[in-house]
């Protein structure tokens, strides 16, 4: 019998959720890879983990799955910076007066962001009225060292609904 990737991940994923007391007694193993999408107002502690009980944070809850950060520049910069070491090492290290813990953090980071504060920069309609200094400030909220740890960056232009809903049979599938 072969073991699928999800089956080999079930125990490490379940261990993190066990520490949090989030396992179901009837189904003690999590059989799906996690997808975590914290709000941009999340604190650095909630993202990385810690607090009085040294709990795992969203980063470790995404272990062997996806951590999706929508509206990336809207996150506090200090919150984003806690991603750097876990992305590099695959582990979150937390040290407090109560002690030290290490939680696994091998996750795929997926981020989304607008090209400027209004979201229209580069759109052919010319709807963006942002000044270059505002665009630079907005994009500058994400540090270079964090972006260095992002393997693929893709610009996706807006596509009108009509273009998506057309029934073009001329295009190859």
Language-model features, listed with the residues they occupy:
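Flexible active-site lid/hinge loop adjacent to a nucleotide/diphosphate
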Residues: 130-144
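Conserved catalytic/switch belt of AAA+ P-loop NTPases
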Residues: 81-101
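A short beta-strand-to-loop transition that corresponds to the Sensor-1 phosphate-sensing loop
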Residues: 70-72, 97-98, 111-116, 133-134, ...
């Amino acid at each position: 019998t072969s073991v699928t990737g999800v089956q080999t991940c079930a125990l490490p994923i379940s261990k993190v959720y066990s520490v949090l007391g989030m396992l179901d007694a009837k189904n003690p193993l999590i059989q799906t890879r996690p997808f975590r999408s914290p709000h941009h107002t999340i604190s650095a502690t909630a993202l990385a983990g810690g607090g009085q009980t040294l709990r795992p944070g969203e980063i470790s809850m995404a272990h062997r799955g996806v951590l999706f950060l929508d509206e990336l520049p809207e996150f506090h910069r200090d919150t984003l910076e806690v991603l750097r070491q876990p992305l590099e090492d695959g582990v979150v290290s937390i040290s407090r007066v109560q002690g030290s813990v290490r939680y696994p953090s091998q996750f795929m980071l997926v981020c989304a962001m607008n090209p400027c504060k209004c979201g229209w920069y580069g759109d052919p309609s010319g709807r963006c009225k942002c000044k270059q200094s505002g665009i630079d400030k907005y994009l500058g909220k994400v540090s270079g060292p964090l972006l260095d740890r992002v393997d693929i960056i893709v610009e996706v232009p807006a596509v009108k609904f009509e273009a998506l809903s057309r029934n073009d049979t001329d295009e190859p599938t």
